[in-house]
A protein has these predicted regions:
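Gram-negative (and chloroplast) outer-membrane scaffold detector with strong preference
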Residues: 21-23, 30-34, 65-142, 168, ...
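Outer-membrane beta-barrel translocator domains and adjoining extracellular loop/strand segments
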Residues: 38-46, 88-96, 138-148, 189-196
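Extracellular loop and loop/strand-boundary signature of outer-membrane beta-barrel proteins
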Residues: 48-54, 95-103, 145-152, 201-207
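Short sequence motifs at beta-strands and strand-loop junctions characteristic
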Residues: 55-61, 104-109, 120, 152-159, ...
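Predominantly the C-terminal beta-signal and adjacent terminal strand-loop region
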Residues: 86, 90, 170-223
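Transmembrane beta-barrel strand/turn architecture of Gram-negative outer membrane proteins
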Residues: 157-168
Length: 223
């Protein structure tokens, strides 16, 4: 993730010399997100019976920082970094119904987003947005009690985002955004169990596919 951030910063710096300086903007956003862990039934718990669902969603507040450029015809292009956020999800099995897996997934993203603005008047506009980028996911957790830990693991996945919203510009150079977007962050898994299970094997692993539905409020300032 550090290398990707550095590479993106270099691209933006290099491109800045060829673009009009007064078309750049910076943005700060706060979001309320519902994180969802899909496909937890793909977790490896051999010989432990059928999958038992637990908590597969978690609501959390987070934030992001963005640097963008205003293009002709009401298009915008930006690089956005979403700050790290950890969420915990649970699942179990019929043979050990009280020994739940507690799957902690720490996520952060670096996205390139495109926006199309549709002005309604001098101050209000609506927009649609789509983005592609990188999601860095780290999985860890435990089973039954915190002493029964899994090894941690991490993945870098292709992430995508789709959304819409409304913008209000109270004064020149300042815009306030209210928006919704769906973000798919791909699959993640922990390492194997770092504890002795009933078979005396390291053959268990927590797995999930992570997404989020986000409502955000943002402040944009044009340079």
């Amino acid at each position: 993730m550090k290398h990707v951030l550095t590479f993106t910063a270099l691209i933006l710096t290099a491109s800045g010399s060829a673009l009009a300086a007064d078309n750049f903007y910076g943005a700060v956003r706060i979001n309320s997100a519902n994180y969802k862990a899909h496909d937890m039934d793909s977790s490896a718990r051999p010989g432990l019976g059928q999958f038992v669902p637990g908590d597969d969603s978690h609501r959390a507040t987070g934030g992001s920082l963005a640097l963008g450029y205003q293009l002709p015809s009401d298009w915008r292009l930006e690089a956005e970094y979403t700050l790290p956020r950890s969420n915990e999800f649970t699942s179990g099995s019929t043979r050990f119904p009280t020994s739940f897996n507690h799957h902690s997934i720490r996520s952060q993203r670096l996205m390139i987003n495109a926006y199309k603005d549709f002005p309604l008047n001098a101050q209000f506009s609506v927009y649609g947005t789509a983005g592609l980028g990188l999601a860095h996911l780290q999985s860890s957790g435990w089973q039954g009690n915190p002493n029964r830990q899994y090894f941690s693991d991490s993945q870098n996945n292709l992430a995508y985002a789709l959304g819409f919203g409304v913008s209000y510009s109270p004064i020149q150079k300042v815009s306030i955004d209210l928006g919704y977007r769906y973000v798919g962050m791909g699959k993640t898994h922990s390492g194997a169990n770092n504890f002795t299970n009933v078979r005396g094997l390291q053959d268990e692993q927590m797995r999930a596919k992570l997404s989020s539905s986000e409502i955000s409020v943002g402040l944009r300032y044009s340079f």
